[in-house]
Amino acid sequence: MNEVEHDEIRQAVRQQYGQVAESEGCGPACCGETTTSADTLSQALGYSADETALVPDGANMGLGCGNPQAIANLKVGETVLDLGSGGGFDCFLAARQIGDSGHVIGVDMTPAMVSKARTNADKGGYRNVEFRLGEIENLPVANGTVDAIISNCVINLSPNKPRVFADAYRVLKPGGRLAISDVVAFAVLPDDIRRDMALFTGCMAGASLITEVEEMLKTAGFQQIRVAPKNESKSFIRDWAPGTAVTDYVVSATIEAIKPAT
């Protein structure tokens, strides 16, 4: 994939999610075309009713494919980074776990999403959360300053995933960790799916093979790598693209890895 194709993908993703941000809710993106509420969708992914009720209205947009909070093991005082933070849902939940002495940074490349998240933070009175405009391949975050990175159904949208993992490694402190929910491929995607931009911006066509994800993480320097597919996710992925064969190839997974302490 050349740089022109990279830019075309970024432009399509930015346009798609800008429209979702302005629509005030779940749109034809990772959640698919659906009339189901964002809270209901999130609870099906493992969030509790209490969690979906805790955040400001408009923060939960129903765009995830899992619950990275469940594997992040966040602690009071930690610095947490959310890759592709959207309306701020996971950031606000993380903020409650890390407390006033901690700090949460959300990075998103879509100006409308960053604006929405900042508005939501003001509505909720969050003082330990900030949102920065930037690409997850080139994070606006200093070296070695983050304890934990979370992300929910975003990295599959990147046209340069090795760069995403390399930059994640850069910003993590020694001993820092990744706790990600994302869509991965368990079989090679056919060309007709890979070339479908709607399926790409819908979090399916850009999925990397599980073995490729593991290799990218290893190359970046990570250890204790674990990619755990969630076969039950096929039921909601099927709803993202009715009438297609995407569930013959992709599944949601949790992705965990550690930056060595020394």
Language model: regions and residue ranges:
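C-terminal lobe and adjacent flexible extensions of AdoMet/dcAdoMet transferase-like proteins
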Residues: G18-G25, C31-G32, M216-T262
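Conserved alpha-helix/loop element of class I SAM-dependent methyltransferases that forms part
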Residues: E33-T79, L83, F89-Q97
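A short acidic, Gly/Pro-enriched loop at the edge of an enzyme's catalytic core
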Residues: V76, E137-A148
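Hydrophobic beta-strand segment of the Class I
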Residues: V80, I149-I150
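Conserved SAM/SAH-binding beta-strand->alpha-helix loop
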Residues: T110-A112
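Conserved SAM-binding strand-loop segment of SAM-dependent methyltransferases
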Residues: G124-E137
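A short glycine-rich, Lys/Arg-flanked "PGG" loop and its adjoining helix->strand segment in the class I
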Residues: P162-R177
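Short, glycine-/aromatic-enriched active-site segment of Class I SAM-dependent methyltransferases
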Residues: A185-M204
